[in-house]
């Protein structure tokens, strides 16, 4: 895959940010920081150019329509509003329709979608959308709980605040018992 990220441009931009901060006492120690930031952005944002549909091509046939849940999957991302990290856990429950992903593939989906400038609400919706569309499952319910450093470090500065977002597709939109089953298992 061709790398589209312009590391040199990122490096130059962060050099300008450091200069714009004013007379920073430790300028000598900061001289390699722009390059380190550019290098770290390659890793942090590697999901930008990856289409999840191209990666999630392997499914397994099943003869079950029972709930499948994978929970407490850690992730981190960067808030697109402030370019500060947010991190937390994802829980995914779905009812298959003859095919499933391997558990590692679900982790891969979360990784790809979170490794880009992101909003938690969009991340939650995208995870649900891709699982629902690719698997053509009966329904999917996604819960994302995260701590945002933009809330902790700036503005209101509330250290213990966590944001919870959900997305429901298919049977989870219409069958309150199915949704209740997931919420009970989350406790």
Swiss-Prot record:
A GO molecular function held by the record: GTP cyclohydrolase I activity
Family annotation (Pfam families): GTP_cyclohydroI (PF01227)
EC number per UniProt: 3.5.4.16
Record field: transmembrane: none
GO biological process, one term: tetrahydrofolate biosynthetic process
Keyword annotations of the record: GTP-binding, Hydrolase, Metal-binding, Nucleotide-binding, One-carbon metabolism, Zinc
Any one annotated GO CC term: cytoplasm
InterPro entries assigned: GTP-CH-I_C/QueF, GTP-CH-I_N, GTP_CycHdrlase_I, GTP_CycHdrlase_I_CS, GTP_CycHdrlase_I_dom
Record field: catalytic activity: GTP + H2O = 7,8-dihydroneopterin 3'-triphosphate + formate + H(+)
Origin: domain of life: Bacteria
Amino-acid positions noted as binding Zn(2+) in the UniProt annotation, renumbered to this chain: 79, 82, 150
Family indicated by similarity: Belongs to the GTP cyclohydrolase I family.
UniProt-recorded name of the protein: GTP cyclohydrolase 1
Organism expressing this protein natively: Fusobacterium nucleatum subsp. nucleatum (strain ATCC 25586 / DSM 15643 / BCRC 10681 / CIP 101130 / JCM 8532 / KCTC 2640 / LMG 13131 / VPI 4355)
The organism's taxonomic lineage, starting at the top: Bacteria, Fusobacteriati, Fusobacteriota, Fusobacteriia, Fusobacteriales
Recorded name of the encoding gene: folE
């Amino acid at each position: 895959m061709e790398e589209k990220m312009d590391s040199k441009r990122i490096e130059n931009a962060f050099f300008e940010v450091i200069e714009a901060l004013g007379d920073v006492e430790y300028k000598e120690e900061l001289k390699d920081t722009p390059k380190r930031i550019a290098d770290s952005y390659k890793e942090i944002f590697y999901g930008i150019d990856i289409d999840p549909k191209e990666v999630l091509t392997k499914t397994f046939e099943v003869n079950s329509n029972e709930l499948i849940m994978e929970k407490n999957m850690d992730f981190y991302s960067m808030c697109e509003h402030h370019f500060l990290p947010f991190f937390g856990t994802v829980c995914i429950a779905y009812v298959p329709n003859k095919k499933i992903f391997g558990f590692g593939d679900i982790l891969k989906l979360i990784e790809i979608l979170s490794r880009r400038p992101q909003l938690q609400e969009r991340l939650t919706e995208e995870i649900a959308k891709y699982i629902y569309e690719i698997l053509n499952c009966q329904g999917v319910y996604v819960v994302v709980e995260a701590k945002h450093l933009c809330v902790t470090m700036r503005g209101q500065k509330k250290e213990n605040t966590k944001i919870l977002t959900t997305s429901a597709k298919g049977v989870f939109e219409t069958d309150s018992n199915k949704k209740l089953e997931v919420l009970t298992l989350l406790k």
